[in-house]
């Protein structure tokens, strides 16, 4: 189980975004995190994936802190893929950060061989997001945190990306925490919804 226990987080000089926030995601669950813009959902995703450290509370995986070294079993896929890659690396090297990436996965995501030698700025947002998803899934994570991963993509690419993500979660029994402002998507995907209120943020 992925658990946020009593999380308090805020940036220096600002009011805490969260105070004592708790959340649990079980294996195989698809939990949608709902709140208006500006409530800090993206920040919470980063805390849960180990990118940010809370001022109080802890993030636990099966009762233990997330590992500080090696590949994290909780993978975050961000809304803006250009912020998740090194702009100086060609995409082949970006993928190599995950180790050996199965050719079948690349095929399922529609990643073309000619894209491998390109830099991030030479790809569209949808193409770059496919690489970020491949990199995350290649590590065989136990939990996926998807923060508006398809917001800026066309409808066909959105459907394709979500099919790959959901197929992985169903096959591996992985838990998912999703942030999305698309009601049709959340209604179709969610097994449970969690709403953030002012008292929690």
List PLM regions with ranges.
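ABC ATPase NBD coupling module
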Residues: 53, 63-75, 89, 93
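Helix-to-loop junction immediately C-terminal to a conserved catalytic motif
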Residues: 49
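Conserved ABC ATPase signature
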Residues: 119-123, 127
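Hydrophobic anchor residue at the start of the ABC signature
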Residues: 133, 145
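A short, flexible loop at the N-terminus of ABC-type nucleotide-binding domains that lies
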Residues: 1-4, 8-20
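Q-loop/switch helix immediately C-terminal to the Walker
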Residues: 80, 87-102
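Conserved ABC transporter NBD signature motif
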Residues: 57-70, 101, 198
